[in-house]
From Swiss-Prot:
Recorded superkingdom: Eukaryota
Name of the protein in its database record: Isocitrate lyase
Motif Microbody targeting signal, residue numbers: 538-540
EC main group: lyase
């Protein structure tokens, strides 16, 4: 086959692939030829693509039934094997990886300053464990006659799809392409990426979040899909927006962000940066410097343009104040994507004069623009991201059902088919946020709004911490009575297979391989005569 014929065949295969229902709602800005020309000669099949297909079908079924796949962040293979018995997806958290699994071995808060391969490595760690326990289970079941297997419980599906945290992509667009490739190669079925700026990225529940313009994040989503297309993967992409609580943005270049960029409304206040530099030159620092900034904020009257317009109307002698404000707000809304120049021109036409509004004056010392997000801001971004993402996720400050409903309805009014994701964050105080009864139904209520995938980011971390604290305390006080009574016996009572940890770890499976390659005879089998796990045969 000629080089050209091979290329033509590749293009036709890609066209056929993209015409499947899987991509019905996906927008691509490049052609099949673009992808085919960037593929290698050898096709490397990715098992993670099978997992992506599995995840997509799983979420389709949940959407159909108005239910949700709900899961939490897994720390290690022990947690994954236990989760697989009850939950239908697995989450890998960047926060947990930052604190417990950085490839630099240096723990850190969730600032995405760990090495780029940290979360992909954790995905591979869990993916290999999933594959191993799946093989182990198959061998154990198939070693029995079919008549006996029919009496066993259904096998555990250890191959639950993994969704992982890609943070902001760890750099520019080429970094996003490479990071996506890592996740595909290491077993991820889906990844999420947020619209914060790299370098200033924070945990979704920290202060000081800096957004990138809408188009910049769309470019990241396109880069994810392009990378997955090059490597022949159906990887799911989840677009997260941190705009609900964001206070800064890197640039004013995208008109879709203009409504939410705040500016100074008092010309006499000057520029914040100039005022702060002057104060530093005077020797002010710490609390004194903060006081200077607070005073500038008070004097400058920093607000959004539509607020400045309303204040100007209300302060004037206009006879039709309500009508003027209503006419302006009818045309300039959180979802209208009105460029600032058009909003200013409309205001000038309605008032007969220009309003002083200067977002350059309000820029902070790092150069970022002031930004006032909120739920409608997140809706606007969610709609913009929808053509490039399989799911949309708004990070929020509280587990607020009314807010979740506002976001879901706002996005779905524009994009009815859109799947949504929700962070059931442990950063929320669930006992003060809602009653136990509401806690029990929260997932199902969100599912009815279209949140088909929900997750507790750090439940693996917190369950690990709780049992470790509880056992360490009891062990220090009661010695082996604590282990026997609070760990081992409950394992037996609950039927937790890890009580027989040698078997759980695959000792019998490996012994079987050893016998297979030695002709059926070996004196060094790990589970032979004398293994202490025989003590548990009557118990489990």
């Amino acid at each position: 086959m000629s080089e050209q014929q091979r290329f033509n065949n590749e293009v036709e295969e890609i066209k056929k692939w993209w015409s499947s229902p899987r991509w019905k709602h996906t927008k691509r800005v490049y052609s099949p030829e673009d992808i085919a020309s960037r593929r290698g000669t050898i096709k490397v099949p990715q098992a993670s693509s099978q997992q992506a297909d599995k995840l997509f079908k799983l979420l389709q079924e949940h959407e159909k039934n108005h239910t949700a796949s709900f899961t939490y962040g897994a720390l290690d293979p022990v947690q994954v094997t236990q989760m697989a018995k009850y939950l239908d997806s697995i989450y890998v958290s960047g926060w947990q990886s930052s604190s417990t699994a950085s490839t630099s071995n240096e723990p850190s808060p969730d600032l995405a300053d760990y090495p780029m391969d940290t979360v992909p490595n954790k995905v591979e760690h869990l993916w290999f464990a999933q594959l191993f326990h799946d093989r182990k289970q198959n061998e154990e079941r198939l070693s029995l006659p079919e008549s006996e297997r029919s009496k066993l419980p259904a096998p555990v599906d250890y191959l639950r799809p993994i969704i992982a945290d890609a943070d902001t992509g760890h750099g520019g667009l080429t970094a996003v392409v490479k990071l996506t490739k890592m996740f595909i190669e290491r077993g991820a079925a889906g990844i999420h990426i947020e619209d914060q700026a790299p370098g200033t990225k924070k945990c979704g529940h920290m202060a000081g979040k800096v957004l990138v313009p809408i188009q910049e994040h769309i470019n990241r989503l396109i880069a994810i899909r392009a990378s997955a297309d090059i490597f022949g993967s159906d990887l799911l992409a989840i677009a997260r927006t941190d705009s609900e609580a964001a206070t800064l943005i890197t640039s004013s270049i995208d008109y879709r962000d203009h409504y939410f960029i705040a500016g100074a409304t008092n010309k006499d206040a000057g520029h914040l940066v100039d005022v702060m530099v002057a104060a530093e030159l005077e020797g002010k620092q710490g609390a004194a410097l903060q006081a200077v900034e607070d005073e500038w904020n008070r004097k400058a009257g920093v607000k959004l343009f539509h607020e400045a317009f309303a204040d100007e109307v209300n302060a004037g002698s206009y006879s039709n104040k309500a009508e003027l404000i209503a006419e302006f707000n009818k045309k300039v809304t959180p979802l209208s994507n009105t460029p600032a120049l058009e909003a200013r021109a409309l205001a000038a036409r309605l008032l007969g004069k220009d309003i002083y509004f200067n977002w350059e004056a309000a820029r902070v010392r790092e150069g970022y623009y002031r930004y006032q997000g909120g739920t409608q801001c997140a809706v606007n971004r969610g709609i913009a991201y929808a053509p490039y993402a399989d799911l949309i996720w708004m990070e929020s400050k509280l587990p607020d059902y009314a807010q979740a409903k506002e976001f879901a309805e706002g996005v779905k009014n524009a994009v009815p088919h859109q799947w949504l994701a929700y962070n059931l964050s442990p950063s929320f105080n669930w006992t003060t946020a809602m009653s136990p009864e509401d806690q029990e139904t929260y997932i199902s209520r969100l599912a009815k709004l279209g949140y088909v995938w929900q997750f507790i980011t750090l439940a693996g971390l917190h369950t690990n911490a709780l049992i470790s604290d509880k056992f360490a305390k009891a062990y220090s006080e009661r010695g082996m009575k604590a282990y026997g009574g609070e760990i081992q016996q409950p394992e037996i009572d609950q039927g937790c297979e890890v009580v027989k940890h040698q078997k759980w770890s695959g000792a019998e499976y490996i012994d079987g391989i050893l016998r297979m390659v030695t002709g059926g005879i070996t004196s060094t089998a790990a589970m032979g005569a004398g293994v202490t796990e025989d003590q548990f045969k009557s118990k489990l």
